[in-house]
Amino acid sequence: MVDFTKVAEEVRKESAAVELTAVSKTKSLEDIMEAYRQGARVFGENRVQEICEKFSSGRPSDMKVYLIGQLQSNKVKKAVSLVDRIESVDSIKLLEKIGKEAEKIDKTIEVLLEFNSSGEEQKSGFRSEEELAEACRFSLSLSHVKLLGLMTVGPLGHDEEKNREAFLKTRRLFDSLKPIYGFSVLSMGMSGDWKTAIECGSTEVRIGTAIFGGRS
Protein backbone atom coordinates (compact mmCIF):
# COMPACT_ATOMS: atom_id res chain seq x y z
CA MET A 1 0.00 0.00 0.00
CA VAL A 2 1.64 3.19 -1.21
CA ASP A 3 0.98 6.21 1.01
CA PHE A 4 3.06 9.18 -0.07
CA THR A 5 0.38 11.70 0.91
CA LYS A 6 0.48 10.92 4.64
CA VAL A 7 4.28 11.01 4.83
CA ALA A 8 4.45 14.26 2.86
CA GLU A 9 2.01 15.85 5.31
CA GLU A 10 4.11 14.70 8.28
CA VAL A 11 7.27 16.15 6.73
CA ARG A 12 5.50 19.42 5.92
CA LYS A 13 4.43 19.74 9.57
CA GLU A 14 8.09 19.66 10.58
CA SER A 15 9.27 21.95 7.77
CA ALA A 16 7.58 23.10 4.58
CA ALA A 17 10.98 23.80 3.02
CA VAL A 18 12.35 20.25 3.21
CA GLU A 19 12.39 18.16 0.02
CA LEU A 20 10.99 14.65 0.41
CA THR A 21 12.70 12.03 -1.73
CA ALA A 22 10.69 8.82 -2.06
CA VAL A 23 13.16 5.94 -1.83
CA SER A 24 11.86 3.55 -4.47
CA LYS A 25 14.70 0.99 -4.56
CA THR A 26 13.34 -2.56 -5.05
CA LYS A 27 9.87 -1.12 -5.74
CA SER A 28 7.92 -1.73 -8.94
CA LEU A 29 7.28 0.93 -11.55
CA GLU A 30 3.60 0.51 -10.70
CA ASP A 31 4.27 1.53 -7.08
CA ILE A 32 6.42 4.43 -8.22
CA MET A 33 3.68 5.73 -10.51
CA GLU A 34 1.14 5.42 -7.68
CA ALA A 35 3.38 7.59 -5.48
CA TYR A 36 3.74 9.99 -8.41
CA ARG A 37 -0.06 10.23 -8.70
CA GLN A 38 -0.12 11.10 -4.99
CA GLY A 39 2.29 13.97 -5.55
CA ALA A 40 5.79 12.47 -5.32
CA ARG A 41 8.16 14.03 -7.83
CA VAL A 42 11.59 12.98 -6.56
CA PHE A 43 12.62 9.32 -6.32
CA GLY A 44 15.77 7.80 -4.86
CA GLU A 45 17.30 4.65 -6.30
CA ASN A 46 20.25 2.56 -5.07
CA ARG A 47 21.38 0.66 -8.15
CA VAL A 48 22.14 1.83 -11.68
CA GLN A 49 20.88 -1.45 -13.18
CA GLU A 50 17.53 -1.01 -11.46
CA ILE A 51 17.28 2.57 -12.74
CA CYS A 52 17.90 1.26 -16.28
CA GLU A 53 15.17 -1.34 -15.95
CA LYS A 54 12.62 1.13 -14.61
CA PHE A 55 13.33 4.36 -16.48
CA SER A 56 15.31 3.71 -19.68
CA SER A 57 12.12 3.91 -21.74
CA GLY A 58 11.28 7.31 -20.26
CA ARG A 59 9.49 8.96 -17.36
CA PRO A 60 7.27 12.01 -16.79
CA SER A 61 9.12 15.26 -17.51
CA ASP A 62 8.61 16.55 -13.96
CA MET A 63 9.85 13.35 -12.28
CA LYS A 64 13.39 13.46 -10.90
CA VAL A 65 15.53 10.42 -10.15
CA TYR A 66 18.44 10.61 -7.72
CA LEU A 67 21.10 7.93 -7.30
CA ILE A 68 21.49 7.49 -3.55
CA GLY A 69 23.50 4.25 -3.42
CA GLN A 70 27.20 3.70 -3.91
CA LEU A 71 28.33 4.24 -7.49
CA GLN A 72 30.97 1.97 -9.02
CA SER A 73 33.23 3.62 -11.55
CA ASN A 74 32.19 1.22 -14.35
CA LYS A 75 28.57 2.38 -13.93
CA VAL A 76 29.26 6.13 -14.05
CA LYS A 77 28.56 6.56 -17.78
CA LYS A 78 25.13 4.95 -17.51
CA ALA A 79 24.28 6.76 -14.27
CA VAL A 80 25.13 10.18 -15.69
CA SER A 81 22.88 9.58 -18.68
CA LEU A 82 19.89 8.46 -16.59
CA VAL A 83 19.74 10.42 -13.33
CA ASP A 84 19.29 14.04 -12.33
CA ARG A 85 21.51 13.89 -9.26
CA ILE A 86 24.18 11.63 -7.74
CA GLU A 87 24.01 11.95 -3.96
CA SER A 88 26.77 9.52 -2.96
CA VAL A 89 30.03 10.91 -4.36
CA ASP A 90 32.71 9.59 -2.00
CA SER A 91 36.03 10.26 -3.76
CA ILE A 92 37.75 12.80 -5.98
CA LYS A 93 38.42 10.02 -8.50
CA LEU A 94 34.68 9.33 -8.79
CA LEU A 95 33.91 13.04 -9.00
CA GLU A 96 36.40 13.41 -11.87
CA LYS A 97 34.89 10.48 -13.79
CA ILE A 98 31.37 11.88 -13.36
CA GLY A 99 32.60 15.21 -14.72
CA LYS A 100 34.20 13.58 -17.78
CA GLU A 101 31.13 11.50 -18.64
CA ALA A 102 28.79 14.48 -18.17
CA GLU A 103 30.96 16.61 -20.44
CA LYS A 104 30.88 13.93 -23.16
CA ILE A 105 27.09 14.17 -23.42
CA ASP A 106 26.97 17.90 -22.61
CA LYS A 107 24.81 17.38 -19.53
CA THR A 108 25.16 19.23 -16.26
CA ILE A 109 24.77 16.73 -13.43
CA GLU A 110 23.97 17.66 -9.84
CA VAL A 111 26.06 15.99 -7.13
CA LEU A 112 26.31 15.80 -3.35
CA LEU A 113 29.47 14.79 -1.53
CA GLU A 114 28.95 12.02 1.01
CA PHE A 115 30.46 12.68 4.43
CA ASN A 116 31.10 9.76 6.79
CA SER A 117 29.98 11.69 9.86
CA SER A 118 29.97 8.69 12.20
CA GLY A 119 33.42 7.38 11.24
CA GLU A 120 32.09 3.83 10.85
CA GLU A 121 34.47 1.62 8.88
CA GLN A 122 31.72 -0.15 6.94
CA LYS A 123 30.37 3.12 5.55
CA SER A 124 31.51 4.96 2.46
CA GLY A 125 32.02 8.70 2.29
CA PHE A 126 34.77 11.24 2.88
CA ARG A 127 36.22 10.56 6.34
CA SER A 128 37.93 13.88 7.01
CA GLU A 129 36.87 17.48 6.58
CA GLU A 130 40.18 18.15 4.78
CA GLU A 131 39.48 15.49 2.12
CA LEU A 132 36.00 16.83 1.63
CA ALA A 133 37.22 20.42 1.29
CA GLU A 134 39.74 19.24 -1.31
CA ALA A 135 36.92 17.61 -3.30
CA CYS A 136 34.95 20.86 -3.15
CA ARG A 137 37.91 22.76 -4.58
CA PHE A 138 38.38 20.14 -7.30
CA SER A 139 34.71 20.39 -8.31
CA LEU A 140 35.31 23.97 -9.46
CA SER A 141 37.38 22.61 -12.36
CA LEU A 142 34.49 20.47 -13.66
CA SER A 143 32.35 22.40 -16.12
CA HIS A 144 29.47 19.91 -16.17
CA VAL A 145 29.21 19.14 -12.45
CA LYS A 146 27.01 21.21 -10.16
CA LEU A 147 28.03 20.61 -6.55
CA LEU A 148 24.96 21.37 -4.42
CA GLY A 149 26.04 20.29 -0.96
CA LEU A 150 26.52 17.34 1.36
CA MET A 151 24.88 14.05 2.25
CA THR A 152 25.35 11.88 5.31
CA VAL A 153 23.77 8.73 6.72
CA GLY A 154 23.23 8.52 10.48
CA PRO A 155 25.03 5.88 12.57
CA LEU A 156 23.74 2.32 12.54
CA GLY A 157 21.36 1.49 15.37
CA HIS A 158 19.05 4.52 15.38
CA ASP A 159 20.40 5.95 18.64
CA GLU A 160 18.87 9.43 18.63
CA GLU A 161 21.74 11.18 20.42
CA LYS A 162 24.37 9.59 18.17
CA ASN A 163 22.30 10.54 15.13
CA ARG A 164 22.01 14.11 16.38
CA GLU A 165 25.75 14.30 16.98
CA ALA A 166 26.52 13.06 13.45
CA PHE A 167 23.93 15.35 11.86
CA LEU A 168 25.13 18.44 13.76
CA LYS A 169 28.73 17.66 12.79
CA THR A 170 27.68 17.55 9.13
CA ARG A 171 25.60 20.71 9.54
CA ARG A 172 28.61 22.62 10.92
CA LEU A 173 30.71 21.45 7.97
CA PHE A 174 27.93 22.42 5.55
CA ASP A 175 27.69 25.88 7.12
CA SER A 176 31.45 26.42 6.82
CA LEU A 177 31.51 25.48 3.12
CA LYS A 178 28.22 27.10 2.09
CA PRO A 179 29.53 30.69 1.73
CA ILE A 180 32.43 29.50 -0.43
CA TYR A 181 30.62 27.08 -2.74
CA GLY A 182 27.02 28.29 -2.61
CA PHE A 183 25.71 25.06 -1.10
CA SER A 184 21.93 24.69 -0.97
CA VAL A 185 21.34 20.99 -0.17
CA LEU A 186 22.03 19.16 3.08
CA SER A 187 20.67 15.64 2.72
CA MET A 188 20.28 13.91 6.08
CA GLY A 189 17.63 11.65 7.52
CA MET A 190 15.81 8.49 6.50
CA SER A 191 12.73 6.61 7.73
CA GLY A 192 14.03 6.10 11.28
CA ASP A 193 15.67 9.45 11.96
CA TRP A 194 14.28 12.10 9.61
CA LYS A 195 12.68 14.23 12.34
CA THR A 196 16.00 14.52 14.18
CA ALA A 197 17.70 15.35 10.87
CA ILE A 198 15.26 18.19 10.15
CA GLU A 199 15.85 19.59 13.65
CA CYS A 200 19.57 19.59 12.78
CA GLY A 201 19.06 21.51 9.54
CA SER A 202 18.45 18.91 6.84
CA THR A 203 16.98 20.25 3.59
CA GLU A 204 16.25 16.81 2.09
CA VAL A 205 15.01 13.61 3.72
CA ARG A 206 14.90 10.22 2.02
CA ILE A 207 12.04 7.99 3.09
CA GLY A 208 11.15 4.58 1.69
CA THR A 209 9.51 2.17 4.13
CA ALA A 210 6.92 4.65 5.44
CA ILE A 211 5.83 5.42 1.86
CA PHE A 212 6.08 2.05 0.12
CA GLY A 213 6.02 -0.47 2.96
CA GLY A 214 8.75 -3.09 3.49
CA ARG A 215 11.11 -4.52 0.89
CA SER A 216 9.62 -6.05 -2.23
List each model region and its residues.
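Conserved alpha/beta-domain cores
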Residues: 1-192, 198-200
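Expand to "…catalyze enediolate/carbanion chemistry for C-C bond making/breaking, isomerization
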Residues: 195-199, 207, 211-216
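Conserved, well-ordered active-site substructure
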Residues: 204
